[in-house]
Amino acid sequence: MIRFLKFFFILFINIPIYAQSEYIYILGNTQDAGMPHIGCKHKFCLDNFSKYEEFYVTSIAVINSDLNKYILFEATPDITYQLNHIKNNVFQEFLLPEAIYITHAHIGHYSGLMYFGREALGSK
């Protein structure tokens, strides 16, 4: 976590942040495998599986509302829902991110990239 915060600080130290037009939008905060984890036998998993459907894998977007642009940190397996969430709650139209930053090579951080291929985003 400390390495991520240092990376985040270094990345944005030279980028001017203007009040209200740029902000961080949290799209997910669960571990790579999502919530509840596959095969979970704990009580909190078994009680009500559906109540966790809006807990998405860790990802954030840095939004610039003046320019109608954003960058995405992490391309998670939940990227379809996360980009739709940005569409419905931020821009009111579907926009692709200007860039996607992957912080490290765990599967939950890059597997969403597959949705940008011909079989998903490129399909007609």
Kindly label every feature range from the protein language model.
Residues 2-10:
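Sec-dependent signal peptide recognition
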Residues 20-87:
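Conserved beta-strand hairpin/beta-sheet module of binuclear metal-dependent hydrolase folds
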